[in-house]
């Protein structure tokens, strides 16, 4: 079993599709079909085999597990998470990050005082949005760009933003 630190979440089963045990897979890879080119494992580190059937008109992946053949079996998989080993992923460029590495990352102001953490990373189609949870437990959505986050390391992110500006 691999520790969750060594696993990167790359997909989640959204729902079943049809009567033959197919599932709709929400892929977090870019492009989305790249998920089927990776060796996938579950949370316990056990190998998972899926086959891509097609990509639908919404861009979702229709897939099938080797050992799932009915709609009822597929329906039970809703929310099932798929991971790949961190070691199997390509080396990242200097300003690239895996979402899992940014979640809960401390956020500092320009004086290096902790002011909150990254709660979530969202994308609604126009670019990544960072959900920031401040120390007072309030949250704000901010664009993920160099203007707002000029410095990001594996240990912290600097936020260039005064809360009363917006």
UniProtKB/Swiss-Prot annotation:
Localization (cell): Cytoplasm
Disulfide cysteine pairs (residue numbers): none
Gene Ontology terms: cellular component: cytoplasm; ribosome
Keywords, comma-separated and alphabetical: Chaperone, Cytoplasm, Ribosome biogenesis, rRNA processing
Gene3D superfamilies xref list: PRC-barrel domain, RimM
Keyword hit for Chaperone: yes
Keyword Chaperone: yes
Main location group: cytoplasm
InterPro entries: PRC-brl_dom, PRC_barrel-like_sf, RimM, RimM_N, RimM_N_sf, Transl_B-barrel_sf
PRC barrel domain boundaries: 94-166
Molecular-function GO term, any one: ribosome binding
A GO biological-process term: rRNA processing
Subunit-level organization: Binds ribosomal protein uS19.
Function comment: An accessory protein needed during the final step in the assembly of 30S ribosomal subunit, possibly for assembly of the head region. Essential for efficient processing of 16S rRNA. May be needed both before and after RbfA during the maturation of 16S rRNA. It has affinity for free ribosomal 30S subunits but not for 70S ribosomes.
Alphabetical list of HAMAP family matching this protein: Ribosome_mat_RimM
Family of this protein: Belongs to the RimM family.
Entry comment, domain topic: The PRC barrel domain binds ribosomal protein uS19.
Name recorded for this polypeptide: Ribosome maturation factor RimM
Provenance organism: Rickettsia bellii (strain RML369-C)
Gene: rimM
